[in-house]
Regions:
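Hydrophobic protein-protein interaction segments
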Residues: 1-139, 143
Length: 150
């Protein structure tokens, strides 16, 4: 997880979208839906608070375009990465209802990549997400609610 987060910090304009349910699961368990406990050790409570607070701060400054998705915009059981240059990747999380395990699909066709990338990068300006300040406030609130016994 640290390697992935480190790589994401090198992206010029980083977009991240998440669900309230996914954030709540992270706060409660310390695991990320796309990094299940079978592969990555859960984050301890103090690190969960630090990650959420840091993400909220980066969203407020505009270093990261992070938004909380409204329910139903994107399914919780899928994760997606996109880049105009490197393609689009979909992979299942442990919440995928039709299988036991993981699967992924990589798309390299340039027009499809541009279409998916364009869809994601336009989301922050739509009614499908909370605004930057609202999203940051939710992250701060969730961080404050993490107890050391979780």
């Amino acid at each position: 997880a640290r390697l992935r987060f480190g790589r994401l910090r090198t992206v010029e304009q980083f977009y991240t979208f998440f669900s309230r349910d996914g954030l709540k699961r992270f706060c409660e368990t310390g695991t990320l839906d796309d990094f299940p406990e079978a592969f990555v050790k859960p984050f301890p409570p103090n690190m969960r608070r630090q990650l959420l607070t840091a993400l909220a701060d980066h969203i407020r400054t505009g270093d990261v375009t992070g938004r909380l998705l409204e329910p139903g915009v994107f399914p919780d059981y899928l994760s997606m990465t996109t880049s105009e240059r490197s393609g689009v990747g979909f992979f299942t999380t442990e919440h995928f209802p039709l299988q036991d395990g993981f699967c992924s699909v990589q798309i390299r066709e340039p027009n499809l990549c541009r279409a998916f990338h364009g869809w994601l990068t336009h989301l922050p300006a739509t009614v499908h997400t909370l605004g930057a300040e609202e999203t940051a406030a939710v992250l701060d609130e969730l961080a404050r609610g993490i107890s050391d016994t979780q």
